């Protein structure tokens, strides 16, 4: 059973260089990743200098685009968890995570992925640079994108024999038209007139 999400406490966003450094230090912790065996990245030269590389990309974007930004997002944090019942190896979990993120983000994104093996359930932590190193644009994501990420994760996980959580179809809020129909049927004005 595979679940991919953004942590609730931060809503998956990193808002400072200090937080980015702390997050990356936690994610690549050698005690959790079997001495960095299950740590890799895309468009990262050295996983040990990931934070510096991501901050350099951000600085370059701000300089070249001449748009220094304040209170912006420095990165995004995703967690992809697997059930012990799926009997996956750490290598397989890491591979699933890499394939998922490469398909979701494309080849130009800058991210690091680390598979934590310190708990009974194996899980990937992914830290994505909010600034794309090739386009120098910011990463944009909406609810539909997160659903697309979940679908990609489910499909790739299924290829490795993982059980998939069946998600109920998402209910969208009432449309304005439905709201007007409801008001017409349930108007308090009729009650006042009577």
Over which residues does each language-model region extend?
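N-terminal nicking endonuclease/strand-transfer module with a His-rich metal-binding environment
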Residues: 1-194
